[in-house]
Amino acid sequence: MASGPILQVNGIEKAFGGIRAVDRCSLAVLPGSITGLIGPNGAGKSTLFNIIAGLYRPDGGEIWFGDARIDGLPPYEIVRLGLTKTWQIPHELRNLTVLENLVLAAKDNAGERLINLFIKPGEVKRDEIRCRARAREVLKLTQLEGLANEHARSLSGGQKKLLELSRALMSDPTLVLLDEPVAGVNPALTGSLMDLIEKLRQNGRTFFLIEHDMNVVMNRCDWVIVMHQGRRIAEGRPETVKADPAVIESYLGG
């Protein structure tokens, strides 16, 4: 792994109606890592992810993605820079096929602008062919190729998690934020999903994930960060964090 962080969060603050959800939180994620973010419900984890992804504007602090300062940028600009996020509850387009869900998530698709259908029809057609080819590559990677023409609403919970990750990969991200990627997924598919994430990491991607499954966190993450009451209270290798008295008291429950 490179020595400098791919993501640097400095003193981020966010309050909702006087309740401070994120309280001067600072952390870093190294490139090529699988970094876990844990903490009790209400610790501010998902709020922090939404701030990083541009869905919430912070009240204070800075966020750097590589050399780019991204706090306050709209989500689509952050995605273009190479950072994307999946959702704890998949946001699939239920009435479209699995393949169509991926095509719509493709990066730099000329068909996104209606006017191009009239002034650049050839470019739109070429982009559609390119996006469909890329979508099939991703579906093969995520083992959903056999479901390409099925409606997304017909997928199981675990398959929808794979679809969510597949859609994220269509933007060719460098860093992927995963919000509880194995929540509600059966043990067999959990193993397959984490194997896939490990394979993607080996191919150059970085993952920062929120997860409550301690088996996944302790066995699959290189580094673990712990939040409590909006702040980072501990970080380190999984075995170190697991033995930290502050973590045991606030989250792991002894």
Give a label for each model feature.
Residues D172:
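Conserved catalytic motifs of ABC-family nucleotide-binding domains
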Residues V176-E180:
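Catalytic Walker B motif of ABC-type/P-loop ATPase nucleotide-binding domains
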Residues I38-P40:
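The feature captures the beta-strand-to-loop junction immediately N-terminal to the Walker
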Residues A53:
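Helix-to-loop junction immediately C-terminal to a conserved catalytic motif
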Residues L114-L147, D195-E198:
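Conserved ABC ATPase "signature" region
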Residues G61-I70, R80-L81:
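Conserved ABC transporter NBD signature motif
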